[in-house]
Amino acid sequence: MKTYNDINIGDTVYIWGTSDSSVDETTITEKHDDRGHWNLKFSNGCVGRALKNGTSSTMGMYACLVYSDKEAVRESINERIKILSNIKI
């Protein structure tokens, strides 16, 4: 899996967690070093922040994450399914 250290300006990243649970694409338009993090700007106008060796970042005011590649999206979805399947109602 890619980390945000591997991501460059112009690369495609994947947004998951929007209201309809779709996976959308955006690109990195700015990437600035901030100690152990990257401050990011995306082509959709939002800004975010990621750990340098992380596979996901936050995005603006949205309750969604931006993943470095599609494998990271799949891993996150599978982990959430595992957590939800263990909840007893």
Predicted regions and their residues:
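Short, surface-exposed secondary-structure boundary micro-motifs
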Residues: T18-S19
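Short beta-strand-centered aromatic/proline hotspots
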Residues: S22-D33
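Short, internal acidic amphipathic alpha-helical interface segments
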Residues: R35-H37
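Intrinsically disordered, low-complexity, charged/polar segments
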Residues: N39-I89
